[in-house]
């Protein structure tokens, strides 16, 4: 994987998109199906030749690029996004230090890839299968991520499955962030550059 500003921006936008969808699903009970599918499909792309191949094209990350450039701020919505981002990246750091968990994750994703030949990725059972990977392997690694939203939606099992599947997609994005050389200093000192890059990409989406 190339270690460029472009690649870091794509990787970080992918995390932003997944956690933004978590927020939308928790608040509204649903979200755009195409964006959801692009997000969840990224989990199954395990041997890409370049960064953008994981998401198909830049347009599939439009929501993430918008979130990166406009919504990481001190507003209530922005603060919630930031909290999810910090939690997901902390979980990924725990995951990267656990070879056993990484092995289990790879095995479970291989099963999903085989199932994709027979089932639509957005089928309830497939989303449930992705959610169970998060619940079984990722969630035990660190403090539980507290997702806030409308209780009427969050009590629905289907919504819970979508949220967990999206958190798995967010962790996948955090793994990519590490693979393209993303470090904490890039978030502290290089965020302005990423925002500028995101705006350039949005202009051509």
UniProtKB/Swiss-Prot annotation:
Keywords (A to Z) from UniProt: Cell inner membrane, Cell membrane, Cytoplasm, Membrane
The annotated topology with respect to the bilayer is:
Peripheral membrane protein
Q: Can you name a GO cellular component term?
A: plasma membrane
Signal peptide range in chain numbering: none
Instruction: State where it is primarily located.
Output: cytoplasm
What family does the entry list?
A: Belongs to the HflD family.
Q: What is this protein called?
A: High frequency lysogenization protein HflD homolog
Tell me the organism's taxonomic lineage.
Bacteria, Pseudomonadati, Pseudomonadota, Gammaproteobacteria, Vibrionales
């Amino acid at each position: 994987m190339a270690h460029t500003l472009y690649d870091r921006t794509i990787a970080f936008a992918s995390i932003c998109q997944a956690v933004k969808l978590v927020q939308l699903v928790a608040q509204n009970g649903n979200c755009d199906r195409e964006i959801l599918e692009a997000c969840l499909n990224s989990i199954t792309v395990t041997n890409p030749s370049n960064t953008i191949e994981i998401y198909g094209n830049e347009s599939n990350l439009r929501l993430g690029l918008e979130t990166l450039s406009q919504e990481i701020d001190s507003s209530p919505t922005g603060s919630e996004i930031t909290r999810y981002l910090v939690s997901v990246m902390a979980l990924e750091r725990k995951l990267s230090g656990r070879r056993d968990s990484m092995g289990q994750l790879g095995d479970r994703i291989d099963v999903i890839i085989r199932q994709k030949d027979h089932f639509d990725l957005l089928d309830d059972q497939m989303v449930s299968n992705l959610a169970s990977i998060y619940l079984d392997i990722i969630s035990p690694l660190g403090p539980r991520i507290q997702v806030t939203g409308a209780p009427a939606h969050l009590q629905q099992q289907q919504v819970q499955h979508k949220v967990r599947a999206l958190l798995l997609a967010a962790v996948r994005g955090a793994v990519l962030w590490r693979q393209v050389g993303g470090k904490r200093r890039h978030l502290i000192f290089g965020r302005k550059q990423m925002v500028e890059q995101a705006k350039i990409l949005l202009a051509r989406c």
